[in-house]
Design a protein with these regions (language model features):
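Short helix-loop capping/hinge motifs at secondary-structure junctions, enriched
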Residues: 36-39, 156-158, 178-180
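Active-site catalytic loop in hydrolytic enzyme cores
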Residues: 4, 20-95, 104, 110-117, ...
């Protein structure tokens, strides 16, 4: 269905899915193109009881180029709990991502604020689409924290939903802004890195 809508409207979609591959199940995210081609990312960092049901992702963090009337943009994907590992967003940024799409079922209350840091430390746009409401399973209950959020490369919140809002947020962004990695005239977040000092 998403592929049909993408073709009709000439748009791209990023969506979370449960993916079956042989006997393995993955918590995955797909980037659906208007031409029907689908890119897949499999969640690297499984959260809590996900480890009982899903296999750890094996795709790695890849960046995909999309194009249309807006020009071109480079998209990376990470899923939910991937956010807590700064290497996730940094890997995507180092590979050229301008926009990091982050479909989520967040239950921890502080991720949406942490996405400010992921955006600023990598000078990218981050788009977190989170679930709202409660889910009951047997005797347990999960509360999803909502507050879907879009942050720009300088840490400005371009949009933020409420905790219980089920909504569509439309925001215009210029992906080229994410190409500027200068913090000051003498500091560039990538050129100033010291990988030789980061080893275990």
């Amino acid at each position: 269905m998403l592929a049909e809508i993408a073709a009709q409207k000439e748009v791209y979609f990023v969506s979370g899915i449960c993916e079956k591959d042989g006997k393995d199940f993955y918590n995955s995210s797909i980037l659906v193109q208007p031409d029907g081609f689908i890119h897949t990312y499999r969640k690297t960092h499984l959260f809590n009881e996900e480890k009982k049901w899903f296999s750890p992702g094996n795709t790695g963090f890849e960046v995909f180029t999309i194009s249309g009337k807006f020009g071109e943009a480079k998209i990376g994907m990470m899923i939910c709990f991937d956010w807590i590992f700064p290497e996730s967003a940094r890997t995507l940024a180092l590979k050229g991502a301008q926009i990091i799409c982050h479909p989520s079922n967040l239950v921890l209350s502080y991720c949406q604020n942490a996405m400010f840091t992921r955006a600023v430390e990598n000078r990218v746009f981050t788009i977190t689409a989170n679930r709202t409401g409660k889910e009951h399973n047997g005797g347990s209950e999960l509360y999803f924290t909502g507050e879907s959020v879009i942050v720009d490369p300088k840490g400005n919140y371009l949009a933020r939903a409420g905790k219980d809002d089920e909504c569509i947020i439309i925001t215009e962004i210029d992906p080229v802004r994410a190409n500027d990695k200068d913090v000051t005239p003498l500091n560039n977040i990538f050129h100033d890195r010291r990988p030789d000092m980061y080893m275990d």
